[in-house]
Amino acid sequence: FVPGALLKNEQTGKSPDITELVGSNHRIDDEKFYQLYERRLMPSLIHASQSSEKSGGALITIPGMGCGAFAGNFQGQLERKIDWVVEKILINHHDKLKGIKGVIFDPNQNPGDCPDSQRKIGNIDYIVKSGEFGTKNSQLKNPAEYGEQFKDTKLFSIVAWDHVSWPGNDFYIGSRETDDGVKAAATDICQTMTVHSGQYDA
């Protein structure tokens, strides 16, 4: 569960992320954007790598974190930036992520200028697959469905986390409107958080 940049605040127009990332010219500072996502993503990437390095390795799916409702005035502009950020993280840190075999970035329902691509970074296959968001099991498929090279890997999926919710977000009240809610519906996260089992009837 990793929050993307919060670039929208309908109450005051400000947030810590806006203050950190957006300059007086109303543009995002690319290096600060990278640093924010690096410090938020790296703990999860390191965990996935270390916990799977001695088995078949990890395949990680990443959604368009912060590209939707929280993008504010930057909606439609962040997909390419996050592609660049993920690629740069893998270039800078692939030697610390030896258990990761593949990373698949799904730029959300608005892929913008972020075309499909595939590249090798160290031992990691980095794949951008646009337009998967909202399709069946788009980020939670059996690893082999993403490619034969991943058939023995363990799937990890980064969840674009709402900044002010428990992991699972609105699925506690039956809504699946967010990446957080959809993945809660597909897993046992609500039960894990609360120790209470529910019933999926949507």
Give, region by region, the residue ranges found by the protein language model.
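Macrodomain-like recognition of ADP-ribose-binding/processing modules
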Residues: 1-202
